[in-house]
């Protein structure tokens, strides 16, 4: 089926999803399987960046992923330590892979790396023991470091470094929610968390322990400008706090966590300066 035919079939099936189960056969199952394969190969992606810098979300692809949970039964997944098994509906991306398949794919997957089928991993990516969920897209030359997670349908750009223990949130439900997007050349510091559809624009640097959600205020220290839901390109961001407001008893209330843009750099400076130097105040 063409992508337009797939989209029509998936949208219709999703509207009638209460009637879809593991016993469903025919066109719907074939369409969902084809979509998952297309996502897995990177031939389609849940979100695409336009020439104007705006991201378009292909909601129907997310619907296909959701339908797969209704269509697919639980099953034993082999490959655990000590010949243990797992019990799930989503097989490993690497099921049945041998040396030739890995060489053709062109990325590294260190023992302990888990990637679920329908996630795309581009060439020269390095996956340390980490987790990449279904529908995600990880572009070329990116590092997903130890115990980092890339959530469902998240979009990770080229030459991104996702440091140890960092979390990139996933989003399948609510269906209208936007996926988390990390654009090219970003650095996500250790134990940071980016969730709830936040966009981190090109070349931005998040220090260790920065937490960003849809309502997190991102304050530019120099200008006082406040951003919500998006980190401007080439920003250097650290954890911070906004002063508390006076309470009814006259005392100052508790402070509120925020993120602080401590500086902005241009592309040339970003490419020539180490992360540690950028984060020094």
Curated annotation (Swiss-Prot):
The record's InterPro entries line, in alphabetical order, gives: DapD_Trfase_Hexpep_rpt_fam, Hexapep, THP_succinylTrfase_dom1, THP_succinylTrfase_N_sf, Trimer_LpxA-like_sf
Q: What is its EC number?
A: 2.3.1.117
Keyword vocabulary terms for this entry: Acyltransferase, Amino-acid biosynthesis, Cytoplasm, Diaminopimelate biosynthesis, Lysine biosynthesis, Repeat, Transferase
Q: Which residues bind substrate?
A: 108, 145
Q: What class of enzyme is it?
A: transferase
| GO biological process terms held by the UniProt record | diaminopimelate biosynthetic process; lysine biosynthetic process; lysine biosynthetic process via diaminopimelate
Primary subcellular site in the record, as a coarse category: cytoplasm
Is ATP-binding set as a keyword in this record? no
Which molecular function GO terms apply here? 2,3,4,5-tetrahydropyridine-2,6-dicarboxylate N-succinyltransferase activity; nucleotidyltransferase activity
Q: Which GO terms describe its cellular component?
A: cytoplasm
This enzyme catalyses:
(S)-2,3,4,5-tetrahydrodipicolinate + succinyl-CoA + H2O = (S)-2-succinylamino-6-oxoheptanedioate + CoA
Keyword Cytoplasm assigned: yes
Compartment(s) of residence: Cytoplasm
Q: In which pathway does it act?
A: Amino-acid biosynthesis; L-lysine biosynthesis via DAP pathway; LL-2,6-diaminopimelate from (S)-tetrahydrodipicolinate (succinylase route): step 1/3
Q: Specify the superkingdom.
A: Bacteria
In Pfam terms, one family for this protein is THDPS_N_2
Q: Which family does it belong to?
A: Belongs to the transferase hexapeptide repeat family.
Q: How does it assemble?
A: Homotrimer.
Q: What is this protein called?
A: 2,3,4,5-tetrahydropyridine-2,6-dicarboxylate N-succinyltransferase
Per the UniProt record, the source organism is Bradyrhizobium diazoefficiens (strain JCM 10833 / BCRC 13528 / IAM 13628 / NBRC 14792 / USDA 110)
């Amino acid at each position: 089926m063409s992508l337009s035919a797939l989209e029509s079939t998936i949208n219709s099936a999703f509207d009638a999803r209460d009637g879809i189960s593991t016993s469903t056969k025919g066109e719907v199952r074939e369409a969902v399987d084809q979509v998952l394969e297309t996502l897995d190969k990177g031939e389609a992606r849940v979100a695409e960046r336009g020439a104007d810098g705006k991201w378009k979300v292909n909601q129907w692809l997310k619907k296909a992923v959701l339908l797969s949970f209704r269509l697919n039964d639980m099953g034993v997944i082999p490959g655990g330590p000590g010949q243990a098994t797992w019990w799930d509906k989503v097989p490993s991306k690497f099921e049945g892979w041998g040396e030739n398949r890995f060489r053709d794919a062109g990325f590294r997957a260190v023992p302990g790396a888990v990637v679920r089928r329908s996630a795309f991993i581009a060439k020269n990516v390095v996956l340390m023991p980490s987790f990449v969920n279904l529908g995600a897209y990880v572009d070329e030359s990116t590092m997903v470091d130890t115990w980092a997670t890339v959530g469902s349908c998240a979009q990770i750009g080229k030459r991104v470094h996702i440091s140890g223990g960092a979390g990139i949130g996933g989003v399948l439900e609510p269906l209208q929610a936007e996926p988390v997007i990390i654009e090219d050349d970003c650095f996500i510091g250790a134990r940071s968390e980016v969730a709830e559809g936040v966009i981190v624009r090109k070349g931005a640097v998040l220090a260790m322990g920065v937490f960003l959600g849809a309502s997190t205020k991102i304050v530019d220290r120099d200008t006082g400008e406040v951003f919500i839901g998006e980190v401007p390109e080439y920003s250097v961001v650290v954890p911070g706090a906004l002063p508390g407001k006076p309470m009814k008893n006259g005392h100052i209330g508790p402070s509120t966590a925020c993120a602080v843009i401590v500086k902005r750099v241009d592309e040339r400076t970003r490419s020539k300066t180490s992360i540690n130097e950028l984060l020094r105040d």
